[in-house]
Amino acid sequence: MRLQQLNLFFLLLCVAKANGSLLPFMDPPITLLADLWSDRFPDPFRVLEHIPFGVDKDEASMAMSPARVDWKETPEGHVIMLDVPGLKREEIKVEVEENRVLRVSGERKKEEEKKGDHWHRVERSYGKFWRQFRLPQNVDLDSVKAKLENGVLTLTLDKLSPGKIKGPRVVSIAGEDHQQGNLNNDGAKQEL
């Protein structure tokens, strides 16, 4: 008797695997839970496709997101890479300030709208962006090189030799018994 039950079970299992099932179809419990969840909480990404949003194209809402950056230090210097897809050389500005700040800015111009155009989707951003970086003391500010290739702006900054790195300057404080002006460590007067 036990052997007949096993044979019947085996037969039903084989038929079920062959897509000619004699057994009623039942979802696994996890699928039933997922269906219950999806009925109560629809996929937020699919919902957004069906809501009739107007396309808001004002400059404040379409400001460019900041450029993504990778910055690495090598034995020879520093390399900063920024993603600026679709921008031309003329649309990007690289500045180095005396306070050791490197600033990269740019602007993607808004595409001209022609009469009769109907926008279905606007995802690319336009407008201005800027990123700035405080450079370490070992960077030679006069050695900054920039190269734009395949939408990636690569900035290369050489390192100063250890003997050329300027440390903080000590300023003497004058009191009642000292002359007016600032003195350096040698006692000589210097301009600030």
From Swiss-Prot:
Which positions fall inside the sHSP domain?
58-176
Does the record bear Disulfide bond in its keywords?
no
Task: Tell me the SUPFAM superfamilies matching this sequence.
Answer: HSP20-like chaperones
PROSITE patterns named in the record: ER_TARGET (PS00014), SHSP (PS01031)
Question: Molecular function (GO) terms listed?
Answer: unfolded protein binding
> Where does it sit, as one GO cellular component term?
endoplasmic reticulum lumen
Q: Which GO terms describe its biological process?
A: protein complex oligomerization; protein folding; response to heat; response to hydrogen peroxide; response to salt stress
How far does the signal peptide extend, from start to end residue? 1-20
Q: Does the keyword Signal apply?
A: yes
Family annotation (Pfam families) = HSP20 (PF00011)
Q: What does the UniProt entry say about where the protein is found? A: Endoplasmic reticulum lumen
Q: What stretch of residues is annotated with the motif Prevents secretion from ER?
A: 189-192
Chief place of localization: endoplasmic reticulum
Q: Which InterPro entries match?
A: A-crystallin/Hsp20_dom, CS_dom, HSP20-like_chaperone, Small_HSP
* Keyword terms: Endoplasmic reticulum, Signal, Stress response
Organism domain of life? Eukaryota
Q: Which PANTHER family match?
A: HEAT-SHOCK PROTEIN 20 FAMILY MEMBER
The UniProt subunit note reads as follows: Forms oligomeric structures.
Query: Would you identify the family this protein belongs to, as annotated?
Result: Belongs to the small heat shock protein (HSP20) family.
- What is this protein's record name? 22.0 kDa class IV heat shock protein
